[in-house]
Amino acid sequence: MIVPRYYENLNVLHENTMPARAYYIPASKRMDNLVEHREESDRMQLLNGTWKFQYFTSIYNIKDSFFEKNYDTENFDEIQVPSVWQMAGYDTHQYTNIRYPFPFDPPYVPQDIPCGAYVHNFEYSRDEKASKAFLNFEGVDSCFYVWINGSYVGYSQVSHMTSEFDVTDVLQDGTNTVAVLVMKWCDGSYLEDQDKFRMSGIFRDVYILKRPEQAISDYHIKSKIEDILAKVELDVKFYSPTNVKISIEDKNGAVVALGSIDEEGTAVLEIASPELWNTENPYLYKLILETENEVIVDHIALRKVEIKDQVIYLNGQKIKFRGVNRHDSDPVTGFTISLEQITTDLTLMKQHNFNAIRSSHYPNAPFFYEMCDKYGFMVIDEADIEAHGPFMIYRKEDTDYNRFKRWNEKIADDPVWEEAIVDRVKLMVERDKNRFCIVMWSMGNESAYGCNFEKALEWTKNYDPDRITQYESARYRNYDETYDYSNLDVYSRMYPALSEIQEYLDKDGSKPFLLVEYCHSMGNGPGDFEDYFQMIQDNDKMCGGFVWEWCDHAIAHGTAENGKTIYAYGGDHGEEIHDGNFCMDGLVYPNRTVHTGLLEYKNVYRPARVISYDKESGELVLHNYMDFDDLKDYVKISYELTQDGLVISKDILSEFSVVPHGEGKTNLKISVPENGKCYLKLIYHLKKELPLLDEDHILGFDESEVSKDDAKCKLAEKWMQKTATDSELQVNEDDTQIHIKGREFAYTIDRRTALFTEMKFAGREYLNHPMELNIWRAPTDNDMYIKAEWKKAHYDKAYTRAYTTEVVQGKHGVKIVSHASVVAETVQKILDVTITWKIDASGKIDADIEATKDGEFPDLPRFGVRMFLDKKLADIRYFGMGPQESYRDKHQAASHGLYRANVGDLHEDYIRPQENGSHYDCEYVELNNSRYGIVASAEKAFSFNASYYTQEELEKKTHNYELIESDSVVFCVDYALNGIGSNSCGPVVLEQYRFDDVLFRFQFTLIPYVKG
């Protein structure tokens, strides 16, 4: 064995590492730009770049001491550091959620453990004023051994934390060689079972810090906020004591406090009339720590986090976390994430009204927290702990009692793991303790509860009593034991139903309630943002939540022939153990293109809302949902009045004061037309430029219907009232068909289905295939559980059959009434249906469909008609909710308007294809080209979908780049669709959004036409 087996030894977590300390970057002189340009410090030597690399499928294949001085690496490959070796073509990709990718046999890992050998030559010049040298690895998965110039330096683990080694005595002036052996797994891998692609290597920065002999080693900044005074306390540790000059400056560079360190290593500085930090105004002071040969520049955010009466306050104000869970993930770089990539994420989050981030499920790179300080995000910092795997071990009795008991016993409540678990929490807290964006420490994720987490919580609360503690998995416990929860500050839940939240508030409510994960954003969804928002706002004990999750996780594998990126998820690399596309559950696509779910979130969490509007008096009442800013200081409000989707007036509202969490009134007197569908839309614009946000950025909108008594869309009404010509109809019947012919049209209805098989108008055939009654949709990710019931009911195989048909012909029209049903093999009749078609001499078709569902069947996915139209009908105009897709429980980001689009534009290209692109609350839709078209219209609003893909194709294909277009425009006119929800990892669709109707009636009109 080339190295000692520390990787399977819980008694050796680290060897020769420096004590954990706060993150900072020193320099020989004052440098104020090191948050985003730390490599410019003359005391930081970045070792990133091209390294020599050799991948071994087994540690036993390493025959040579590659780490020896002057070892010949000519036969080694090259790899970029930082990176993960799977993204460089070594090993295989694997995505797994809960299951360990190796046997559960702690502390042991597979004997033939894969590993990577890294070698890098670099030049080093000793600085006489900074003669000490410390080698830092900010992230290595999973554990590693390190040598310099052939001398063993040390060993460490905890993939997402910094490991620091004193290498002063092994470095030499001139050329040096660092060698690193990285193991794919170690005993620590049992604590790193996070829901993500499993990747390996040196994935964060590597650098040397040059330090004076007499220098600060660590410091802890604490603050106390009083009425008009802030006290800043510093506790400082040294490698060797030295004098320290301390100064604090405001954002304009004015010195507001001076001080020095006393003999105890402490200092207290006072700031009069302090500016407090919050997410809306992230004010930072600059802290300068100056010694004889070194300057450390840091920043301070003055803020106070506390819990009073089970309510969380920031600076004395009740707050709500508008948060999101964020993994380090990129389709090209894996979980090697640059500062630029983080900036992209933070910018998108600000643009979409987030104010908080959970570092799920491990600490991020240290500069991430500096950026959150700067840009105004509250953070839950989470330890690099997830031991979910024991939940999946074999149990003879698979009851909840036994499941939780066994889960707890294996790691959380086994004292042999105490040092490892507490170590990970300490490393996080020590490194990030000076980052004021962090308002809450999380002990980890989904690892059950026991004595080891009691110890971790106890240490954390004793060390840092000013921050909140959180650990959702505390609720998963061994019911035979009594545990201590006294150091846990909030009650956290993942994906609870609204009824479960209410039950806690009614029966317990002893701690603030935190939705640490909610509204699972997988595929088309979520559909319940608004409902959770209302629950959060209705009770002060509800402190908000963190949506799961920020981005889809996928691996990019080039471009398909159709130009689409080939994104791979679980199982696409041949791995046996995987969890499919469960990693595709973000608010943005892997490349950070925005999902419609993110648009939905943005408008649900808009800064203000209309409480009421009286169109007669013009009184407008708004509620300000900002926590700290008066609305007049943050938002400029414009308005638009539309009639049947067209803007008829618009202007800017005069500013008026609405205090945070308060309501305010103004007058907006507008002249509403006597007829038509009229809406008043208030648009909230950012009033001032902010970090990451431009002035006039749209923060959200409100829409209120202000129609008068004649509240019908005139465009829809015009088509529906189209008058018949004087020509008579010809009707011919046989055993299977009914032919209806007018001056400009010829239609055929199949007696066996009671539906159209031909629809010719002006000599053109509109239907490529027969019309269908449609109750199926390509299951969404959020349909993953109800889909089983739907398929058991054979909804996906359903078809229409007719029993009797009666034809009644008049002078200018014909009425065809059929008794029919929707049926499928092996099951009873799903729907009993009466279908009535009225066709007038102009070719207009009025439909009236009455349906009765057998009550034994589950909720329907949808009900409507599906037509396969001439593919040349590619241009769309519609009056309804748009421009993006919208559903009965997912339309907060859509608004009523008269929209134009191309059929291809309506497709939402989810990486795993599924139902998408529907438009809710429509009264009129027109598909056309330059010469002819067809209109669907109704008095009662409907949904429609126009796509180049059939629902069968969407269901069949597992990746978007595999989709093949139909020969038709697939046009669905729907009475209703079942809600979207978030049941992929959340509660079932709320009752009010379920399509559970037993009796329903769908009336609509179809009108083919030619232009001119």
Question: Where does each model-flagged region fall?
Answer:
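Extended substrate-binding grooves/exosites of carbohydrate-active enzymes
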Residues: 1-39, 88, 96, 151, ...
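Glycine/proline-rich low-complexity spacer/linker segments in large multi-domain proteins
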Residues: 2-26, 31-38, 153-154, 177-210, ...
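Accessory beta-strand-rich segments of carbohydrate-active enzymes
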Residues: 3-18, 37-38, 52-58, 84-92, ...
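An acidic-aromatic loop/edge-strand motif
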Residues: 84-87, 92, 99-108, 157, ...
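Beta-strand/loop-rich accessory regions of lumenal/periplasmic or secreted enzymes
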Residues: 87-89, 184, 278, 669-675, ...
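Extended acidic/polar, glycine-enriched regions
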Residues: 172-175, 237-308, 678-719
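Surface beta-strand/loop "capping" patches
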Residues: 213-240, 595-635, 721-735, 849
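Intrinsically disordered, low-complexity Pro/Gly/Ser/Thr-rich segments with frequent PxxP/GP/PP motifs
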Residues: 262-272, 645-675
